[in-house]
Amino acid sequence: VAVVGAGGTGAYYGGALARAGADVTMIARGPHLEAINKNGLQLNSVLLGDFLVECAATDDMSSVGRVDLVIFAVKSWGTDAAIEAMASGDMVGDGTMIISTQNGIDSEPLLSKAFGSEHVLGSTATVSAMITEPGVVNQAGGPGSLVIGEMSGGSSGRVTSLVERCVAAGIAAEADENINMALWMKFTFICALSGMTALTRKPIGDIFAQETTTEMYLQVLSEVAAVARAEGVPISQEMVDATLKTTQGREPFIIGSMGHDLIAGNPIEIGLLNARVVEMGKQHNIPTPANFAIEAALRPHEDGA
């Protein structure tokens, strides 16, 4: 297994598999890479417990060789460079499966274009995990789920077996025969969560404590769903309302990944999330004022502080 981008999310899933005995190589860089090589990866998780796992780590993808599974977990601004390095590193062989934990709806098409659609499974990862210091990842929120499916729909032996391996490692994994719907539902959820927590620089508890921000949160969700329907994905208003209700029941301290990146002064994924909704809305003549407001406020921060 190769984890391309061993930040919070990649390290959580890769660390769980490594603890269960999988041969995992973490692709990381800088002090985080040095710390993993020196001390191992320390994962502190409310779901999996706290543990230290020894695993290979490198910043050179050409040294990894062929793998059975790639977990593609880089931030969106690193996608093109990571795909290029993967391609030159000969990591993808005949039977290699690639799953992406990235936010957004664009990584599966990009990976399919680079490596062939037969290698790419659809997947959605829902976990709140972050690097708190080099070599240390904390997972404090989110269900830690991983939903996997064939992009063409239906079931397959490779999806079933991958899900079984993940479940055996303690990951809340499941197969989905309509993964495209799952990808769009996650996109809808994350545009609101990340967009609104970045816009307000506040966790969801503070957002839902105010009528105005709750109303805007729902508007973001509804706009994404309208765009999804225009793209042929039937997300109903009932599903939107259920998503809002579920989010309101989550831990009040949760901040979306874009909110964390903004607060830390890192580049943010606005182009992949709310701005993408605005772009698709224009294509379909669907107004997206709430997503546009988020894009307008956050574009100046796109490249970090």
Question: What kind of feature is each model-predicted range?
Answer:
Residues 1-46:
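NAD(P)+-binding Rossmann beta1-loop-alpha1 motif at the extreme N-terminus of oxidoreductases
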Residues 15, 19, 84-88, 113, ...:
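Short, well-ordered alpha-helices that flank and scaffold nucleotide-derived cofactor binding pockets
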Residues 41-57, 190:
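N-terminal glycine-rich dinucleotide-binding loop that anchors FAD/FMN and/or NAD(P) in oxidoreductases
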Residues 50-136:
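Rossmann-like NAD(P)(H) cofactor-binding subdomain of soluble oxidoreductases
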Residues 89-93, 114-119, 134-186, 191, ...:
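Internal alpha-helical scaffold of NAD(P)-dependent oxidoreductase catalytic cores
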Residues 218-305:
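NAD(P)-dependent Rossmann-like dehydrogenase/reductase catalytic/cofactor-binding core
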